[in-house]
């Protein structure tokens, strides 16, 4: 029996990496009976057959798991946002941060296309990013002439997953970091202000200290796993301020003596962050119940 990490899934075949050696495996029928499927990122025990093939017997407990797309045991989630084309959006960034925290993932913010944005656009984005740095988020800016290896060297060891809407430059980033990958890229749609999906499945690529993965571009972010009462925990600044509210179950919407709203009025919590919290809270409150 060998132990390795699933690095790719295509047509029901799980490719497992064991210290640089790859095996094509399939899960035993027991998994199907239990209605449980391994995912990319899983640590598995498998039995070798025919030298480079085998059957998965056991999946180790997951530290965390992203549902869409399915990938597990992530050490850092890099949220890729472009400065322009598509334009930088704090609302979208906050939604990705909520997703990250809801799945117990450590997020990092990476701003691409630094070189094609105007000086005025970059200064405006940098002023905004300072607010995220104050909250505690690690942030980086890159452009075409950046040192991609130095950028990645700042990241955690283990599995790094790139996430972000289509067209922000995730595949371009990976191609610049590892030119041998030759991943397909597309220009963004001018009418939709977003890119066409070019990554169709999750695959882990080797890097110094671990792996790196692109994810299929998101056309919509799914918050169905989050209850409205949980949302405040996924806005880090709001969560910390909320500990001083008069009522323990304060949702910072209409409740009296709310410390969060006091800090928003004082400018200590950015108004746009609170607005995004309210918008998402209302969306979750108004969603239809699924049966």
Curated annotation (Swiss-Prot):
Residues involved in GTP binding: 112-115, 164-172
One GO cellular component term: cytoplasm
Keyword list, A-Z: Cytoplasm, GTP-binding, Hydrolase, Metal-binding, Nucleotide-binding, Ribosome biogenesis, RNA-binding, rRNA-binding, Zinc
Entry annotated with the keyword Cytoplasm: yes
Location in or out of the cell: Cytoplasm
Amino acids binding Zn(2+): 245, 250, 252, 258
SUPFAM superfamilies associated with the record: Nucleic acid-binding proteins (SSF50249), P-loop containing nucleoside triphosphate hydrolases (SSF52540)
Matches recorded under CDD domains: S1_YloQ_GTPase, YjeQ_EngC
Cofactor: Zn(2+)
Top-level taxon of the source organism: Bacteria
Residues annotated as domain CP-type G: 63-221
MF (Gene Ontology): GTP binding; GTPase activity; metal ion binding; rRNA binding
Top EC class for this record: hydrolase
Known EC number: 3.6.1.-
Family: Belongs to the TRAFAC class YlqF/YawG GTPase family. RsgA subfamily.
Oligomeric and partner information: Monomer. Associates with 30S ribosomal subunit, binds 16S rRNA.
Classification via NCBIfam families: ribosome small subunit-dependent GTPase A
Record protein name field: Small ribosomal subunit biogenesis GTPase RsgA
Source organism: Staphylococcus epidermidis (strain ATCC 35984 / DSM 28319 / BCRC 17069 / CCUG 31568 / BM 3577 / RP62A)
């Amino acid at each position: 029996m060998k132990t390795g990490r699933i690095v790719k899934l295509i047509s029901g075949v799980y490719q497992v990496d064991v210290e640089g050696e790859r095996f094509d495996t399939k899960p035993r029928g027991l998994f199907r009976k239990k209605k449980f499927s391994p995912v990319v990122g899983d640590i598995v025990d498998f039995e070798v057959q025919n030298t480079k093939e085998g059957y998965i017997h056991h999946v180790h407990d997951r530290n965390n798991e992203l549902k869409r797309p399915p990938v597990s045991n992530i050490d850092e989630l890099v949220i890729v946002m472009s400065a322009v084309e598509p334009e930088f959006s704090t609302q979208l960034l906050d939604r990705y941060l909520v997703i990250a925290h809801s799945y117990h993932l450590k997020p990092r913010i990476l701003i691409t296309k630094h070189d094609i944005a105007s000086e005025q656009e970059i200064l405006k984005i940098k002023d905004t990013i300072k607010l995220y740095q104050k909250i505690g988020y690690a942030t980086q800016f890159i452009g075409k002439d950046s040192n991609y290896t130095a950028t990645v060297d700042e990241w955690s060891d283990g599995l790094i997953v790139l996430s972000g809407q289509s067209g922000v430059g995730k595949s371009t980033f990976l191609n610049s970091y590892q030119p041998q990958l030759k991943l397909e890229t597309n220009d963004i749609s001018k009418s939709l202000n977003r890119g066409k999906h070019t990554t169709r499945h999750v695959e882990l690529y080797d890097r110094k200290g671990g792996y790196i993965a692109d994810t299929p571009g998101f056309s919509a972010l799914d918050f169905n796993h989050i209850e409205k009462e949980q949302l405040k925990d996924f806005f880090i600044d709001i969560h910390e301020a909320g500990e001083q509210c008069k009522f323990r179950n304060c949702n910072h919407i209409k409740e009296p003596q709310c410390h969060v709203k006091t800090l928003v009025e004082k400018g200590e919590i950015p108004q746009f962050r609170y607005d995004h919290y309210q918008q998402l809270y209302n969306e979750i409150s108004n969603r239809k119940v699924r049966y």
